[in-house]
Structures are given as structure tokens and as C-alpha cells.
Amino acid sequence: MAATLLDVCAVVPAAGFGRRMQTECPKQYLSIGNKTILEHSVHALLAHPRVTRVVIAISPGDSRFAELPLAQHPQVTVVDGGDERADSVLAGLRAAGDAQWVLVHDAARPCLHQDDLARLLSLSETSRTGGILAAPVRDTMKRAEPGKAAIAHTVERTDLWHALTPQFFPRELLHDCLSRALNEGATITDEASALEYCGFHPQLVEGRADNIKVTRPEDLALAEFYLTRTI
């Protein structure tokens, strides 16, 4: 079977709360239009024909997910997530069956464009390690003095990228790297960092900068603008 026809399973870690949003409702359950942020994020994945299944890792005490139409979607599976993102991703990988390649996507990143997703998925034809959507840094970057709100120095932005999601890897490779990194006490901030820890160098696939993660209150209005405009 050609690599371009291989089915892909997506894992969405959605067990976090997101305290920076300053709401009692977890950010993934805030609404934009008639859908929650989580629903926008998941439907963007399922819109691609290669993504045949999505595993969502939620908090064991989550009572909101069952109320969503998404809970009855035939291509959606739900598992209990963990205390940390990496634990939730591992739980999702264990439920991914025999999928050779997996996407991992933030629950609160609802503005994914199909062109970006298609270019990321094409890595299964050319790469053995996969890669991530990312955006080149365009702003001037400053390093702060340790523990102070004062500039230590300007950071050279050449070759700096903002890591986005989805991130796309062979399932077994990601599982092994995440497991090893956690067992050895490494700091894992995203899935690519687990592969980096194990000596791999995932590819950077340039994506649109409007593929934002809803993290702070002002992000909600921006995401709504991006989702409702026609481009």
C-alpha cells in the first residue's frame, strides 16, 4: 500500500484545565460559535481523509465531554488521561491500535488549516522520524535576567521556530521515546522534545501563524475571528 494511503490515528490530550484562561470551565470546552474549542480542533483533524480515528484523552473526572455530540462520533475514542501531557499522549498511543503513524494535536488549537495538515501528513512518504508544524520566529526575542523582568540580552532569531501542532510521528517511535524520556526524568514540553531527547531530529514543516493555541482570554476572540473569516 502506498504511504500516502496509510490511515492515521490522531491523539488529542484534553485532560488539562488551562488556569491562564481565568475561567472555571476548562478552555477546551469554551465555545466558539456553536461548537466547543475541542470540537473545532477534532473536526479539523477528521476533515482529512487519512485521519480515520481520533483518540481523546480526558480527565477521569471530566463530566463535560459526554454531553458533546462528539462523544457519539463513530471515529472518536475516549481514554482517561494523566496528570501530565506526556501521560495523556501515552494513554492515547496505547489506544491507537496498529496505526503506523500518529498525529498529536492540542485540544485548544482550533484553527488548523487543511493545507498545513496535508503537507505535514506527506512526511510519511519521505521521513522515518516525522516532524511538526512550526512557524518561523518573526519578532525580536529577548532573554530575561534570571528571576527578573529585565532584559539580559537579545536572542538571535535566525533559525528559531515556534513549535505548533499537530506533530506527526511513527507510533512506535513516539511511544518508545516518550516512555524512555519519562522513565529517565527528562523534561518533555511537546512530543518532538521526546524524540530530540532520544537523538532524533524531526523535520520542521512551515505552518500558518494563525494556527494559534487558546491559552489566555484574549486568544478566544482571535480564534473566533480566524474561524469565521473566509480565506
Swiss-Prot record:
Q: Which organism is it from?
A: Citrobacter koseri (strain ATCC BAA-895 / CDC 4225-83 / SGSC4696)
Q: Where is this site: Positions MEP for the nucleophilic attack?
A: R157, K213
Q: Which family does it belong to?
A: Belongs to the IspD/TarI cytidylyltransferase family. IspD subfamily.
Signal peptide residues are none
Disulfide bond entries: none
- Gene name, Swiss-Prot/TrEMBL: ispD
Part of which pathway?
Answer: Isoprenoid biosynthesis; isopentenyl diphosphate biosynthesis via DXP pathway; isopentenyl diphosphate from 1-deoxy-D-xylulose 5-phosphate: step 2/6
Protein name per UniProt: 2-C-methyl-D-erythritol 4-phosphate cytidylyltransferase
Which reaction equation describes what this protein catalyses? 2-C-methyl-D-erythritol 4-phosphate + CTP + H(+) = 4-CDP-2-C-methyl-D-erythritol + diphosphate
What Gene Ontology biological process does one annotation of this record name?
A: isopentenyl diphosphate biosynthetic process, methylerythritol 4-phosphate pathway
